[in-house]
Amino acid sequence: EFSGRSINLVMSNRGWKALEDVGLDEEIRKIGIPVDKRAIHLQDGKLNYQYYGKEGEAIFSLSRGVLNRKMVDLAEAEGVEFFFERKIWDVTLASATLWEGETEQGDWTELKYDKVFGADGAFSRIRHRMQRQSMFDYSQEFMKIGYKELHIPANADGSPKIDIHSLHIWPRGNFMLMGLANLDNSFTCTLFMPIEGENSFESLTNEEKLVSFFANYFPDTKDVIPDLVRDFFRNPTSYLAIMKCFPWTFNDKIALIGDSAHAIVPFYGHGMNAGFEDITILNELMQQY
């Protein structure tokens, strides 16, 4: 289902190692696009390239939705069972018991397990319960920058409007636009910008201001983002936060992994890779013990 708040993912060596360890790397490469360089779009229309490494070295662009669906398919093929549209409101840590219900105030059903891994994201319910334990450290910092998804469609003949093997960046000081390719030769673009201030989401209140802003700062996008106005005012402005906590485990019953343990901003390109690296460590521990 379209959410209008997606940032394409970038897979680097940290992530590939985790997938190789569990035998999923070849299947995931099939849905990725190799990206060997940055394409830097300057305000005067010039285009510069910065290669990431030696010839043949590349990171991979992955659609978040496509990756999620592929990972579910691969897991189901190995016998993993998924339950969708289920709401977990609380957890009893000592017994690894989840509490499920339709509403936070309604009747809950008890679900007991041997172990629970909290992979429930930056605003984790599992971590929220762990925060009430003594000696549990937690910090949360919201950035003053938000983001909004925009879209570059493929041409009518299916060809891409810009180079699919580049991570496209339009750097403009304290705000920027970036774009990564999808399998259908479209691009998912993300506008990162302050929430408030002179050049901010707060300041772009109507079509005239938006079109003028893009004409001034991103002039070469005029012909490649045909639905700029629709996308900008339809898609939500989302927020960015850094979250840290420790410890990530409770006895031998509960463990946090991924963003529930360590959410970071997307600029480093390592949020997903750090999450997969948790699986590298988990897999090593499973082999050891």
Give the role of each language-model region.
Residues 2-74, 78:
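Active-site-adjacent segment of FAD-dependent monooxygenases/related oxidoreductases
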